[in-house]
Amino acid sequence: MSVNKDIIIALDEGTTNAKAVAFDSHGRVIAQFSRALEIATPQEGWVEQSAELLLAASLEAISRTVAAVGAERVAALAISNQRETVVGWYRETGEAIAPALSWQCSRTPAFCHKLRKQGHEPRIKAVTG
């Protein structure tokens, strides 16, 4: 007997929590899980989060929601994230290079302005889009 893949799970990896919600084929919420996240402000205007905790909270939210509905029923996973929040990961180890720089952080405008003045903007746009 085959099982219908009739569930879509949406992960909202937000600033304050990672939340996964399972929807059935009629758009009804049938399961959900949320894990709170912490924000750090190590200096005035800086906003960052632990990249490892963002990943762990997201994986936990997905895992618990999948467990509630049964993996065999899941057709797809949709992911939304925190705007321009950035995390770099080491390819070899899978560890974060640094904390996640939040979209709320204001530490980089002066650096970006300097790069523009030095003529690097076209290259950066070509590489990053």
Q: What are these language model-derived features?
A:
Residues 1-98, 110, 122:
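N-terminal glycine/serine-rich phosphate-binding loop of ATP-dependent small-molecule kinases
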Residues 104-129:
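Glycine-rich phosphate-binding loop plus the immediately following alpha-helix
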